[in-house]
Amino acid sequence: MSYEPATAATVAGLSVSGVKTMRVALYQCPPRPLDVAGNLQRLHQVAMEATDADLLVLPEMFLSGYNIGLEAVGALAEAQDGPSAQRIAAIAQAAGTAILYGYPERSVDGQIYNAVQLIDAQGQRLCNYRKTHLFGDLDHSMFSAGEDDFPLVELDGWKLGFLICYDIEFPENARRLALAGAELILVPTANMIPYDFVADVTIRARAFENQCYVAYANYCGHEEQIRYCGQSSIAAPDGSRIALAGLDEALIIGTLDRQLMGESRALNRYLSDRRPELYDDLSKR
């Protein structure tokens, strides 16, 4: 069996031409529940340490903490263009680095969502994504589920998709983004013990089966009864990890490389070898 050269690889109509590398930083940290001002301050400090990265990714609900309850999440929820977004836009400009952060979003109709927002290095809001698959009583007690909206945006020549924590555990979500052209799927998370196998195994599997990069930014430490499992990572299309944190606070940086993605797609043609006519009924069950 012969393959086309990796440098010319196009799989399922997805080209790997363009800007060759991107530097992505993940900040793994213990949560500071209810301390928005304190979280903005440490974001500023971390962003100044990550100025050599093109993008800084923070955990799920970074601004407010995750396990904070309905009353607190209602009090701390903000609009997409709220005061915290304006502050983070200024931080992104000062650092010259795009920032993806998790926060409780209050929509114009009063619904509260578990959301992430991307602000570029010029301080412009590029994208807001709402968690679509809510996890257990914890999420269901605080948030409304996001609707059928899986945005794909371009940053520095790379196509980015977004998921939040539990979303990545449904393989259809990552595949949908990959088929739409995502080269990097960003996953702010608040993953806890005993689900650490997700950080260890699932993230690499999603990257490999979809032939794209997956960046997974988790908490460490604990929040009330929750013990977070750390292990933030950037998984490559070949299933390797180009950056990996342990169990403690860490700022890790990895370089995404289009050549590696092209080589991997030339060897593993999952996207073009699909037979969707065999799977149509699966999503209807």
Swiss-Prot record:
Signal peptide segment: none
Domain of life (superkingdom): Bacteria
Keyword Signal: no
GO molecular function terms listed in the Swiss-Prot or TrEMBL record: N-carbamoylputrescine amidase activity
Enzyme class: hydrolase
PROSITE patterns: CN_HYDROLASE, UPF0012
Catalytic residues, chain numbering: 60, 131, 165
Name the UniProt record assigns to this protein: Hydrolase in pqqF 5'region
Any single Pfam family the record assigns to this protein: CN_hydrolase
Gene Ontology biological process terms in this record: putrescine biosynthetic process from arginine
InterPro entries: Aliph_Amidase/BUP, C-N_Hydrolase, C-N_Hydrolase_sf, RamA-like, UPF0012_CS
Annotated organism of origin: Pseudomonas protegens (strain DSM 19095 / LMG 27888 / CFBP 6595 / CHA0)
Keywords per UniProt: Hydrolase
CDD domains given in the database record: R-amidase_like (cd07576)
Annotated Gene3D superfamilies: Carbon-nitrogen hydrolase (3.60.110.10)
EC number(s) from the headed UniProt entry: 3.5.-.-
Residues of the CN hydrolase domain: 22-258
